[in-house]
Regions:
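Glycine-rich phosphate/pyrophosphate-binding loop and the adjoining helix
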Residues: 3, 169-197
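Glycine-rich phosphate/dinucleotide-binding loop and adjoining beta-alpha-beta core of small-molecule
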Residues: 35, 41, 46-173, 183-185
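Flexible, glycine-rich phosphate/dinucleotide-binding loops
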Residues: 15-16, 56, 146, 191
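Glycine-rich N-terminal loop/short-helix segment of MobA-like nucleotidyltransferase
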Residues: 13-27, 102-109
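Single conserved hydrophobic/aromatic residue that forms the stacking wall/gate
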Residues: 1-7, 12
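Hydrophobic/small residue at the entry helix of a nucleotide-binding pocket
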Residues: 32
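Short linear Ser/Thr-Pro motifs
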Residues: 5, 28-29
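Short pre-catalytic strand/loop immediately N-terminal to key active-site residues, enriched for Gly-Thr
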Residues: 23-28, 113-115, 191-195
Length: 197
């Protein structure tokens, strides 16, 4: 979600449509985004929430403005409009790739289908590299291997102030779960473990 004055947050997955019926997306329920919003409300933040397709119930408050952004391109456009904030939290499960050639008609079933993908805009990196970047930026990373080194590389590449690292624990992939597992990494390389909560 992105917030307009005191804090800002970006949340929830998008869809990159192949045709009017089919799409590619990332796994995400939206529970984490709503938990962040609830926490920000307790601290009296005014919030603009940029979101894709939700599987969780919205929190209704006069301090929250919801903006539907169905894909990475539209989410980046809205993020740029709302970048002059004190705090921006980028926890959206944005698809890294979109479809090169969208079909306006439903693609008929074949024995095989080859899709040409194109790289989507990097929202976090674009906003953090902007001259009108938020005062504080927090990115998110979900890693499955070499988690700390990959997270450190992402923090440096994206140029955000903090990175929330999530990774699977035991047999729990964390997705669609009431729990998260991981910690917080800052630009100095300091890591605070949160664990499974």
């Amino acid at each position: 979600c992105i917030r307009d004055s005191v804090g800002s947050e970006m949340c929830i997955r998008d869809r990159e449509y192949i045709d009017p019926v089919r799409y590619i997306s990332n796994e995400s329920s939206g529970q984490q985004g709503m938990a962040l919003i609830k926490s920000l409300l307790k601290k009296n933040y005014r919030i603009v929430c940029l979101h894709g397709y939700l599987q969780t119930k919205l929190i209704i408050s006069p301090k929250i403005k919801y903006v539907f952004t169905p894909n990475a391109k539209s989410m980046l456009a809205e993020a740029k409009k709302n970048s002059k904030v004190d705090l921006a939290i980028f926890n959206a499960a944005v698809a890294d790739y979109g479809i090169q050639n969208y079909s306006k008609q439903k693609i008929k079933k074949k024995s095989a289908l080859n899709l040409q993908l194109k790289k989507n805009p990097d929202i976090l990196k674009t906003i953090c590299s902007s001259k009108q970047k938020p005062k504080t930026t927090i990115g998110f990373a979900y890693e499955t291997n070499d988690v700390f080194n990959n997270a450190k590389k992402k923090l440096k590449t994206k140029k955000c102030d903090y990175l929330i690292l999530n990774f699977p624990v035991d047999s729990d992939p964390i997705f669609n779960s009431k729990y998260n597992n991981g910690g917080i990494l800052n630009i100095k390389g300091d890591y605070i473990e949160i664990g499974k909560k």
